[in-house]
């Protein structure tokens, strides 16, 4: 639709991303920093996926979900970071209509998947701590696969709202996107067609998913906390807390940023603040998650040592 003419107006076929800054020196500095972050993100998440796959002691539901979370983190970061790095070095930061749609769609898809997987992982911790005797029975391989497949289906359904909305937007005027990627809000501002209905639908679906998954997480940890407080063994409490700390940290970072970006009224913060928080959410958090889940996890550290030891003997 972006390639059709609208009366006397020529439809926009490419967009200019204004990015984070116009300063040439800052662009080089940001390029260097974000490139390092992206390389650590790719290495950390790929290492997590491969370690879980090759280590038999990590073939449990918790690590099955963690491997999918690492895949999603790779997807979130890769949906925007490579093009952002290229734009830092380009004189004119442009993106095609199709490229913009793909970027918007992939960011929405992986962002939704992260919400679902964090909720699934909270349920996994609830079953492991509150119902340990039923854990292996309830979270069978088949059920774990069903939870992950359901997460992907839910994410694709939500993503279809973004795809359809973007497809029906008509861009015939300004083509400067005041962001470092094609986020929905600045794209709606550029649309010549009425985007109010699309905005309401997407706000409802995205808000419903955010709140529903957050409620699942809160309820799960409410029962986990009650169970931990009832434990008589100090060692048992510490072990239970340690298994939840990593996940709670990841949840706090992720939901804190998306609530700031998509739930808080836009009048309470500036566009530049939105860019910084979006950068943290899409670039920094995917790098931090492998570190968060590995530094406090003795099973992952043990599996990593075992693999290194095995390599040195070969």
Curated annotation (Swiss-Prot):
Disulfide bonds join 100-192. It is found in: Cell membrane. Signal peptide: none annotated. This is Olfactory receptor 5P64. Glycans are attached at residue 8. Its main location: membrane. GO terms for cellular component: membrane; plasma membrane. Residues 1-28, 79-102, 158-199, 262-274 are extracellular. It comes from Mus musculus. It is a multi-pass membrane protein. The chain crosses the membrane at residues 29-49, 58-78, 103-123, 137-157, 200-220, 241-261, 275-295. GO terms for biological process: G protein-coupled receptor signaling pathway; sensory perception of smell. GO terms for molecular function: G protein-coupled receptor activity; olfactory receptor activity. Potential odorant receptor. The keyword Cell membrane applies. Residues 50-57, 124-136, 221-240, 296-314 are cytoplasmic. Gene3D superfamilies: Rhodopsin 7-helix transmembrane proteins.
